[in-house]
Amino acid sequence: MDTIKETDSFSKYQIGEAVGKGAFGKVFKALNAETGDFCAIKQIEKTIISEKQLPSIIQEIKLLQTLQHPNIVKFIESYETSRYLYFALEFIEGGSLAKIAKRYGCFQEPLLSRYFSQVLKGLAYLHEKGVIHRDIKSDNILITKEGVIKLADFGSCTYSAIDRKLTVVGTPFWMAPEVIQMDMNARSTACDIWSLGCTLLEMLTGNPPYWDLGTMPAMFAMVNNPHPPIPNNISADLKHFLLACFVRDINKRPTASQLLEHPWIKQHIHEPSQSQPASSPEPSRIKSSGSGSKLSINTYAEGYDVESDDDTTNSNNGSDHDRIQQLESQKKEMTETIKRLKLHFLRAMKEKKVMKDMISQLVTERDEYMIKLGLTPPPLPPILANATLNSKSSLDSSNELLNKESSQGNLLGSGGSGSPYTNHTRSSSAPLTAPGKIISTHQIHSPSLSNSSASASTSGVSNNKERGSSILTNDFFHPPSDDDQHSPTNDLFLHEHFEKNLKVTASSSPSSLSKNSRLTTKFELESDNNTNNNNNNNNNNNNINITTTTTTTTTTPASNQNLGAYYQSSGNLHLYTNQNNLTNNNINNTNNNNNNNNNNNNNNNLGSNTNVDMYLRTSSEKTHLSITQPVSLSGALSYGDHLNPSVTIGGHNSLKQKGSGKTSIPVLQKEPSNKSLNSLNNNNVNNNNNNNNNNNNNNNNNNNNNNNNNNNNNTNSNSNNNTNNINSTNNINTNNINNVLGTSPSRKISNSDQFTPNRKSSQPIAPSFSLLNQSLDRNPNSNNNNNNNNNNSNNNNNNNNNNNNNLNSGSNSFNNNSPISSFTNNNNNNESGDEYDDDSDIIEDEQSSNSSLSFNNSNVPQVESVVVNVQPPRVGDECKVKCGDGWYDAVVDLVSGSTFVVTIKPFKIKREVSHSDVTLAPLQFPVTATKKKKFSLFNRK
């Protein structure tokens, strides 16, 4: 050891042999050369103490010098060198209880009661001074020759007024659970009580609890078991004493002063009187007073009943008084606990409401975005679907209560020695409880969501459930109704034939038509008051008055029971009639004398020429041309000289007026979009030119030869300009991609074709035909060979013949331009079945050719596999898809869950693909060995 200088005060001690060794160093027996008394010198290495901790420890040791108690080893003085700390302590000759137990065996209960009563007195003194021993065990309990117990080994002692102490705070087998768990709030005098119980078990059994398990398992068992195992061969009082020491709640664990009043301690303290035999001493009852009553001990251990002294009235009165005080204390504690629980519950309610509002806002934004993308939003989360939001009044009251309780700031008691929840002294370095008041440190400001927003989200989700389950249906890819801030309430369809005499009146100028405006068009059938009606089959030469008005609000179709229509900006013009009108097959209306004048006035009201983009939809994927189901048509409805190239025609969703020009028959032109004719499965539209020309003869009751000539001339003009001989095609072939009936291969695309943009939906394309020159028969097995010549009252046979000749002339010129045979019903599902040779390509207009390359979804094979560059695929990524035997370019349009949608570029169709079919090929795509065959729009002769 270091040499102590002679000039130092510690040089008076002469160091002798070592009498012990601890975790911090050795203990030597020393002689005080000045007094001749023996003392113990404890040597501690400074290397185990950090420089920051050293000053506080020195101060703590000096404070320990002030401790003076008969059951505590006297601390004499300390000394410091460069390597060690020296403590001069009172020397105890008897040694420790561990050595005595090892030498003489286990102790009996009476002797243990005497010894531990002195230990409790020493602990009570230390705890009153604020000192926590932290290492109570048999090795640190010394005994003199007279049998006096002394608490020693303050190497791990801490003074509770200093923040940090020595690193070693006990031995694992004697440590309390809160110390093992390193609970900073548990650094109190209660840990010495737990260690005292473990030391008592050591004296009874010879080993501390869980000694046979080892260090780590013993610590685990100490934390998880309710209490250490208690021997069965002990008295009930001792068992009760041990259970009181092993109470896990530090607030309910008794103090050393309270344990001194335990019956097991008291019954062995007294000295037996001479009159009483020593064999059967009866313990004397010591009256309890203050906090150390025997009643308070009973509250710490279950199942133990202390016998009451029925002969002592004062003792009973004292017990009742203590019991009343205890009950009042428990009542007060329960009241405070309930108040704290209520506060936390209200705070949790408020935070839950804020969380629901944030989730509701996120769900609403997600649903709106998915609807715009055409996706079906998922159902609401359970927190919004099942739970109901609290009312505003309850939330306001909870906020008021929170503010009130926060302002009081006394709901949670401080962790000092004056805390009403425990009698143990805590270390000031770590508070036992939370701060004294609960104050909201920050206010969460989230965007407020009203109940209407949440309900809007719910309704939005419910409305989207009406969509089809498959994301590849036509309704799914159709433009959503809210794109233009309005949507029609229902879709009705045109069930009658299109052979109508149209009278259109536009009440608003084109400049007044905006994106958010809607045109409500009413179709009315003029009744015929004349009696000169011939029995013509399916001759619907009706006069239709069309009145167009502009409104900025959502309107419903006209209430007319015969025929109606409405205009939608995102989906062109919708025409429809009721099903009841289908039975009126024979409507033979004749015109009055002023038929020509009416037609002229009609054209004047339209501003000479008016173009209306229009289409009709069906609710099913396939269109069957039957009399009971509507047909889906699409195109541009043109009034007047719409084929004049010098006139600029309004594009998609427009109802615009052009310059003045001569009036002509309205013609529905083909829309130039890559749409497929949606399953018009081999339905024949048999149109005979001669019969249709006869149908277009508007006969007058009086002498109307000139009127008929004008009418037929207009028809011929439209026939020549509008692809000539519109009715020359007999059958529609769904697999031959061309959807135009009788279209000349060398024709130029009309103005309506050029300015009508593509729609997003996969709607079927209607064939081009004249509303007056074409009668659409919905029966595929019937021919339109009807002699619908309405004879005039003055026998205008010559005029009719001239009209027919004019029409036939148009048909002949059509045949001269391109000798095209009528379409056949050869359904070929192979996409490469139709071929054409480059030398025989008769299509002159490239735009017309490209615009008609549309495919039916049923003709393209299903996607078997997909090759992408990035996994998982993202929207806009290029990829390759395998359909049948070929690979095609595609692009990813939508990604949703386990599937995503790709658009196959050559076919302009969409396919839904599972992620399981995707193959990652970052370097190259599959290459097909065979050249992809081309499609022919027309069959070669």
Swiss-Prot record:
SUPFAM superfamilies: Protein kinase-like (PK-like). GO terms for cellular component: cytoplasm. The active site is at residue 135. Residues 394-405, 420-431, 654-663, 740-778 have a biased composition (Polar residues). Transmembrane segments: none annotated. Its cofactor is Mg(2+). GO terms for biological process: intracellular signal transduction. ATP binds at residues 19-27, 42. Belongs to the protein kinase superfamily. STE Ser/Thr protein kinase family. May play a role in responding to changes in cAMP levels. This is Serine/threonine-protein kinase DDB_G0283821. It comes from Dictyostelium discoideum.
